[in-house]
Curated annotation (Swiss-Prot):
Alphabetized HAMAP family for the sequence: AMMECR1 (MF_00645)
Origin: domain of life: Archaea
Species this protein is from: Methanopyrus kandleri (strain AV19 / DSM 6324 / JCM 9639 / NBRC 100938)
SUPFAM superfamilies for the chain: AMMECR1-like (SSF143447)
Residue span(s) of domain AMMECR1: 8-200
Membrane-spanning segments: none
Annotated protein name in UniProt: Protein MK0488
Pfam family of the protein (one): AMMECR1
Length: 207
């Protein structure tokens, strides 16, 4: 990952995500936006999370774990997919629903594989409040963003177990030598309320 984003750049991405969803729901077309800074033109992984306000109930979360697209383009696509393509939820159809939705954008570092001699070492290498994780076995994978264990109050074992479940694997699969674990970090920018001020979350402080 390149340099960290400024709060202004994070705010731009959050506003862009909202604009992209509303524009798509109104017109069926994907918005095109030029990156205002060089950092926002870099290829980076990104996830867009939609939460119902004020209870923070999840409404959708989609993204790109790998840095395969320029950040602005990836944010637009992830936002639209989070609103209309998350299989866990009915697709959003009415733009007015966005008036009750809070947006969070997580900008990721490239995933890094953890090398261990014993799977139990994973527990020591993962830091709650810092790391997101990806569990992989063949074509199956499960990703959890770093804010998830903080919000759920999980420890490292629970974090690993839930990532396995998300991959469609048994919860203790992380103990298997066939399992691959990747970690990444994220800058997380969120609206305090729908269309409200944007802040950068400090996950370590939230624990």
């Amino acid at each position: 990952m390149g340099e960290k984003l400024t709060l202004e750049e994070g705010e731009f991405l959050v506003r862009l995500a909202r604009k992209a969803i509303v524009h798509y729901l109104e017109s069926g077309k994907k918005i095109e936006e030029k990156p205002p800074t060089q950092r926002l033109a870099e290829k980076r992984g990104v996830f867009v999370t939609l939460k119902k306000y004020p209870d923070d109930e999840l409404r959708g979360c989609i993204g790109f774990p790998e840095p395969i697209k320029p950040l602005v383009e990836a944010t637009v696509e992830a936002a639209i997919s989070a609103a209309t393509g998350d299989p866990r939820f009915p697709p959003m159809r009415d733009p007015s629903e966005m008036e009750e939705i809070k947006i969070e954008v997580s900008v990721l570092t490239p995933p890094k594989k953890l090398e261990v001699d014993n799977p139990k070492e994973y527990v020591e290498k993962i830091e709650i409040g810092r790391h997101g994780i990806i569990v992989r076995r063949g074509a199956r994978s499960g990703l959890l963003l770093p804010q998830v264990p903080v919000e759920e109050g999980w420890d490292e074992i629970e974090f690993l177990s839930h990532a396995c479940l998300k991959a469609g694997l048994p919860p203790d699969w992380w103990c298997s030598p066939d399992c691959e674990i990747y970690v990444f970090e994220a800058q997380v920018f969120e609206e305090e309320e729908p269309e409200g001020p944007v802040r950068e979350r400090d996950l370590a402080e939230e624990q």
